[in-house]
């Protein structure tokens, strides 16, 4: 009953307005406001500040600046093996596996289509997926899982339902309903996609090459083509791609049949860290 009420209230909320108000508050550089919000978040979400490069909260210019904090150097070691695909984020590996009949697993007994996720009937050769949920206490920067060249970026406007165990099990096509940013890369295994999924109270999605894109900065689908000769945006595995200002979800799509996850496919809700081995590229 409580779960259904929680979902119903989210349908009534003005998602975009709520997230914009949160964004404005989170960007405030008023010392009293931002320090209070940071202390509140640390206590509420049990944030491990010891891992942060900057542990003095007074040094953060805003609440958002704190939420996209950097980690201490070498805290998340990464494999140099080119055949290892790394986790792009700290969080929980909620679902992963093979894309079957153009469908991905959202939660136990609940599927959604690849076509609806990327808002295109051209689903290329995507065969595997991994979904990582970032809670408010997690490190919020998103890193490149494999060496690659940026070819395209697509912004898809949508709702901003919260993302958690309740909504993933109750809201149909949650990840295909929410606002999202899809970044396509050319890699040694073919095309991959790194998808930033927005959520309620997420005060923004930013990339290192474009800047802030969400929430709801555009009313229609927007596409940026980086495949022309004037662009040559390359990333090494582990490089920072962008970040969330609060928390949400990252979905990775990979091509081909030579990707094998390092976990059993009947596992889910696995705690994972950025740069940790996620999958292997097999011969």
Curated annotation (Swiss-Prot):
Pfam families noted in UniProt: PS_Dcarbxylase
HAMAP family, alphabetized: PS_decarb_PSD_B_type1 (MF_00662)
Cofactor remark from the record: Binds 1 pyruvoyl group covalently per subunit.
Subunit note: Heterodimer of a large membrane-associated beta subunit and a small pyruvoyl-containing alpha subunit.
Pyruvic acid (Ser): modified positions: 248
Site (Cleavage (non-hydrolytic)): 247-248
Post-translational modification: Is synthesized initially as an inactive proenzyme. Formation of the active enzyme involves a self-maturation process in which the active site pyruvoyl group is generated from an internal serine residue via an autocatalytic post-translational modification. Two non-identical subunits are generated from the proenzyme in this reaction, and the pyruvate is formed at the N-terminus of the alpha chain, which is derived from the carboxyl end of the proenzyme.
One Gene Ontology cellular component annotation held by this UniProt entry: plasma membrane
The protein's name in its UniProt record: Phosphatidylserine decarboxylase proenzyme
Cofactors named for this entry: pyruvate
Reaction(s) catalysed (UniProt annotation): a 1,2-diacyl-sn-glycero-3-phospho-L-serine + H(+) = a 1,2-diacyl-sn-glycero-3-phosphoethanolamine + CO2
EC annotation from Swiss-Prot or TrEMBL: 4.1.1.65
């Amino acid at each position: 009953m409580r779960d259904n009420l929680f979902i119903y209230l989210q349908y009534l909320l003005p998602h975009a307005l709520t997230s914009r108000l949160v964004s404005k508050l989170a960007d405030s550089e008023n010392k009293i406001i931002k320090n209070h919000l940071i202390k509140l978040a640390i206590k509420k979400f049990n944030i491990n500040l010891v891992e942060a490069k900057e542990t003095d909260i007074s040094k953060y210019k805003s609440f958002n600046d704190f939420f996209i904090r950097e980690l201490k150097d070498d805290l998340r070691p990464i494999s140099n093996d080119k055949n290892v695909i790394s986790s792009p984020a700290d969080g929980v590996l909620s679902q992963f596996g093979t894309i079957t009949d153009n469908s991905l697993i959202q939660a136990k007994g609940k599927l959604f289509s690849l076509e609806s996720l990327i808002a295109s009937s051209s689903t290329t050769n995507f065969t595997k997926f991994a979904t990582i949920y970032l809670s408010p206490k997690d490190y919020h920067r998103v890193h490149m899982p494999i060496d690659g060249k940026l070819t395209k970026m697509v912004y898809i406007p949508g709702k901003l339902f919260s993302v958690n165990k309740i909504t993933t099990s109750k809201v149909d096509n949650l990840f295909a309903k929410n606002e999202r940013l899809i970044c396509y890369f050319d890699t040694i295994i073919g095309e991959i996609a790194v998808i930033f999924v927005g959520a309620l109270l997420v005060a923004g999605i930013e990339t290192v090459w474009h800047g802030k894109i969400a929430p709801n900065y555009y009313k229609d689908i927007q596409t940026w083509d980086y495949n022309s000769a004037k662009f040559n945006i390359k990333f090494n595995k582990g490089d920072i791609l962008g970040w969330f200002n609060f928390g949400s979800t990252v979905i990775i799509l990979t091509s081909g049949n030579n990707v094998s996850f390092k976990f059993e496919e009947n596992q889910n809700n696995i705690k994972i860290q950025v740069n940790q081995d996620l999958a292997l590229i097999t011969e």
